């Protein structure tokens, strides 16, 4: 079980209360697909992913980015039970979708960059540490079903 300080709990909740999922989610997911193009192989049904402009303007990318944010919101609401919270998603991604679990870390890194750009000076080292701790536990939880 992960130990969360009061500061970490409040910071994580505050970050997710402040950010606009409809902007941050699509931006983070698009960044992941652009920076790490091999991640595109899981999204062949998304249509045009041929270049950065196409990815950024793709409504399927935007929709999935928002879905990711709502998935993370579930974790924010269940900080003490993240492994259980993400058990079904872990099974889905490992057994049905066969997603490389390293991709979860890639999207978390992209999300950190986008959140930092949105929060500006408020994204201090302490805030970053809390967010990255949360994302690391989510990544671990999503990878739990992989053998």
Swiss-Prot record:
Query: Which organism does this sequence originate in?
Result: Liparis tunicatus (Kelp snailfish)
Pfam families xrefs: Globin
Q: What is the tissue localization of expression for this protein?
A: Red blood cells.
Q: Which gene encodes it?
A: hbb1
Functional note: Involved in oxygen transport from gills to the various peripheral tissues.
What remark does the entry add?
A: This fish has two hemoglobins: Hb1 (major) and Hb2. Hb1 has low oxygen affinity, it displays a pronounced Bohr effect, which is enhanced by ATP, and a pronounced Root effect.
> In what residue span(s) does the Globin domain sit?
3-147
Listed binding positions for heme b are: 64, 93
Protein name per Swiss-Prot or TrEMBL: Hemoglobin subunit beta-1
Which GO BP terms, alphabetically? Answer: hydrogen peroxide catabolic process
